[in-house]
Amino acid sequence: MTLDIVFERYLLTLHAIVVAIGLIVYVAVARALPQRRDPSAAIAWVVALALLPYVAIPLYLMFGSRKLLMRDAPALLPPIAPAAAGDDEAASLWARRLGRSMGLAPAAPYEALRLHADGADARRAVLEVIAAATRTLDVCTFILARDRLGDEIAAALRAKAEQGVRVRLLIDGIGAWLSGRLDVGPLRRSGVEVVTFVPPFRSILRGRANLRNHRKMIVADAARLWCGGRNFAAEYFEGDPERGGVVWHDLSFDLHGELGARAAEQFEEDWNYATRRSSGAHLVPAPYRIVPPDASLAQLVPSGPEQVDDTVQALLLSGCFMAQRRILAVTPYFIPDATLLMALSLAARRGVQVDLILPRRSNHRLADVARHRPLRDLAAAGARLWFTPFMLHAKAIVIDDQLALAGSANLDLRSLFLNYELMVAFYEPADVVRFAAWIERERSAAVRYEPSEPGLVRDLSEGLLLWLAFQL
């Protein structure tokens, strides 16, 4: 009997030590690299570490990191003078200054912006940018599929490498697995450097299993940029007749100018992280030059674990409060956090016309179920919700005529708080109007969504999926 009591006390002591270790690990990681978690997520981790330490500690080490970088906060900037009526440059100054305060590169000039009308136009632009490279060609994507479109792009990359151009392909580890394990042998034999960003199994050992590089860009000679929401798979462009010919609507664009050099620097940072090289190993950053007063300006907005702030989220929140007339948004998945949902709702309540366009049915059924609760809240605030009959994969937001954000980030928790994402903030009013026109074209094919009250089972399932939304 005495031995049983001693053994029980030993087990309780050992359990208490394990719990203490788990909580110490949580506090130590949070102190070393502030994670800026939502309070509910922080509470959930603490409760799990206290009640289920043997399960929670390994999970936290594998999936718990959200931020990987800590740096000193930039100096605060002086107040902005009130903008005069019709002063377009001053109207968007808030967004540029916010970006700089978060450590982003300053807005850079660009020219020859092309918004691709459809998948065929986007495919031609991809091949044109690849063909234009004479020195360097950097490609970052989440998916490079083993289909007709993926094979065509891979062949173009091999051809460029054989011409002596330095070609680098950075593909996400999860994306490479989802797309059927790309055959990298022919690419590497042609001279293409191929690196997997955070391979799934190795990432578990590094505590990065929950982080994905969702960025999509092609940079030629650090001067031409192709960017947007399209993965390199047939359905994002013209479809593949052998797979049913399904075509998704998506948004991409290309341009020339100094913004391409900023994109090359961003690719270099991602490449160095994936290859574990020191930053700046191959690329000397282009100097910031004096920008002509009449230049069109845009700013790269990378978001993810390497950024101290949640940059896209911060711009969206500020945009909701700065908007005076309209907010146009298109996204395939809508699972915002409570703060962004409140900002959009408040904008609608004070008379800003808020239009949100989504596909009636996306390629993620669970996300479709989880979105209904925030959609009901937004509709109750006076926003207009639209469902397209086709799969809409575009990601863009327009604030008045001041700002257009376009790129890879969805309006969901994973894109806003976990993934490596890349958006471009356009400040040229004429180009902001062009993005708005693109979104309006998609809206013209949509049907107004009028939400209805859910039953008990649906309400419970929506709540459960929202709780699990980081994994969707």
Regions found by a protein language model. Name each.
Residues C320-A323, D337-L340, A367, R371:
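Hydrophobic alpha-helical segments and helix-packing faces
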Residues F142, T331-P332:
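Structural motif
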Residues Y333-V354, P359-R360, H364:
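Helical hairpin unit composed of two closely spaced alpha helices linked by a short loop
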Residues M1-Q313, S318, M322, S362, ...:
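N-terminal localization/anchoring segments of enzymes in phospholipid and broader phosphate metabolism
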Residues L356-N410:
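C-terminal structural cap/anchor segments
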